[in-house]
Amino acid sequence: MPIQSSGAISLDDIHQEVGGTANSNCSINDADIRGLIDASDGANTSFNDWYGASNVTPRGLFLGGNGGSDSNVDVIDYVTIASAGNATDFGNLSNGRARTQKGEICSATRCLVAGGNGFEGGASNNANSDKEVDVVEYVEFSSTGNAVDFGNLSAHKEYMAGGSNATRGLTFGGYAGSEHINDNYNVIDYFTIASTGNATDFGDTLAAVRQSCGTAGTTRALVF
């Protein structure tokens, strides 16, 4: 449940909100604790900054996809997870895109969408162009609106797996079609979700893979 919005809170309260064990060692500059409010490393913070913070995202987002008739869509919809009902318009991606990462790359406040099959500035939305992109965009859960540029992947690719621990986001593998190298990737890219910028090399998967799914906890990510 969210941290209280008034009164005294402790570092232990914050640590437990991000999944830490009560009364265990931690620091206010730990990545998972900072990630709860998207604070950068070494930022000047106070406990009041964590008032109302929650490691549970109240909204679910659906970003882009293929709309049929060989056309990608740029629509972002959302639902309020606590209440059953139809999706509501949130905003738009910069262009129609499908085949982005499978697995969320999110913090408590921000959601990223990486790569995919789409367009880098052209007006066309025809999925038959088979053009992979390296674009990474983000939205803030708290306010509806269009996606904003975050940075770029290490290469143009689609069909990656994704995962995050609220502080760091990862993409695994992927595929580049005839537009580029026509091959699978084994590269793992990572982002610090609180800070916009390009992907950094994390390592490699055991094999070059595409169309995998990803999931992550606070300390480990799985690809399957």
Positions of predicted regions on the chain:
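Polar, enzyme-active/binding microenvironments
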Residues: 2-224
